[in-house]
Regions:
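A cross-family signal for N-terminal binding/gating loops and helix N-caps
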Residues: 1-353
């Protein structure tokens, strides 16, 4: 897929009152105290639940595949204001195969930042800790290849803060942006579909006979913008997970992906190994620019647990691989009219075959 492809978006307005401004814990609730909408292919009626009911909605023999990437505090504000701009914040997005990083420059600091389209190759930005970030070449209208004068992840763990957008009015510690499965640091933004999982939900799933297997995909900043080419993300599908996926499918179980990142990892690995046509998962690791859409289809994933996505988000492309337009339109109409909450601290949607 290239930038020439138009967004197949669901036309709707996301009203501010539908944005989740804080995690459930802020109101004294548990992480798993969010709402869960369930849709099924070929079934007109939707069902609405609490997330704690998830174990009863999956079947013994199903496999839940989760992303064990941990969120890094990927935002850092430059120490020296830029002429004509003022404060500049750097969002570290993606580690690249050559050792550099894709970064997004944003004007402002803290919550009130906006994309900054300027910049020139060779520009040096001074960061806290006497560290220098050098822009090397432009990747897209908003992203730059850049190199840091020290190792990136250890630096961010010491000096960075979680990326936060305007709909979240106050800062939260990095722990609020980690899932229960987080193991390997690398995601600029939380693989948020798995945020509602808690140890009690995991225990209930296993007791139900649902297996759980990990993949790793380090996700970058936000959804692609219109006209923007996909950027590569690092992924790893272990051999044990690929075997579990194939065994589940062979024995009649369903493979459920906890998040769009899991779908991308599994489908990228199958395609890289030339096994997608046979519906077989494969062990693979590397970088992927694969975008899953209705046109590409899905080869090894049967269902998807995901958050609610913004209008014109490219994540909606992927939902088209699991449901037709009428079903998706109905889901999003119900979500808006019933007061579901969007974004990383919000409610979730389970798409089943």
């Amino acid at each position: 897929m290239t930038a020439a492809v138009e967004l197949e978006a669901l036309p709707f307005e996301l009203r501010p009152e539908l944005e989740a401004h804080e995690p459930p814990e802020a109101r004294g609730a548990a992480r798993d105290d969010v709402r869960l909408m369930v849709s099924r292919t070929g079934v007109a009626e939707l069902s609405e639940h609490r997330f704690a009911e998830l174990p009863q909605l999956l079947l013994p023999g199903d496999l839940l595949v989760v992303n064990n990437s941990a969120t890094i505090p990927a935002a850092v504000t430059c120490t020296t204001p830029q002429p004509g701009i003022g404060s500049v914040t750097v969002h570290f997005s993606t580690a690249m195969p050559a050792g550099d990083w894709l970064v997004e420059l944003r004007s402002g600091s803290g919550q009130a930042t906006a994309p900054l389209r300027g910049g020139t190759g060779g520009r040096r930005l001074e960061l806290p800790g006497d560290v220098v970030l050098t822009l090397t070449e432009r990747f897209s209208q908003r992203l730059w290849h850049a190199r840091l004068s020290t190792a990136v992840i250890p630096y961010l763990l010491r000096h960075g803060r979680p990326i936060r957008y305007s709909y979240v009015p106050r800062p939260w510690p990095i722990e609020a942006y980690q899932t229960v499965f987080a193991t390997w640091p690398g995601s600029a933004e939380m693989p948020s579909a798995a945020r509602p999982f808690t140890p009690r939900i995991v225990t209930a799933l296993v007791s139900r006979g649902v297996s759980i297997a990990p993949v790793t995909l380090h996700t970058g900043v936000s959804s692609l913008e219109g006209g923007e080419d996909p950027y590569p993300e690092s992924y790893d599908v272990p051999a044990a997970t690929a075997r579990m996926v194939n065994l589940t499918r062979q024995t009649g179980g369903r493979v459920i992906a906890a998040g769009t990142t899991v779908v991308r990892a599994l489908e990228s690995a199958a395609a890289a190994a030339g096994r997608a046509a046979g519906g077989l998962a494969a062990a693979s690791a590397g970088w992927t620019s694969h975008v899953v859409t209705r046109q590409t289809g899905v080869a090894v994933v049967d269902g998807l647990l995901t958050g609610l996505h913004e209008p014109r988000s490219t994540h909606l492309w992927m939902l088209g691989a699991f449901a037709d337009d009428d079903l998706l339109r109905r889901c999003y109409q119900v979500a808006r009219s019933h007061g579901y909450r969007w974004h990383e601290f919000g409610d979730v949607h389970l798409l089943l075959p």
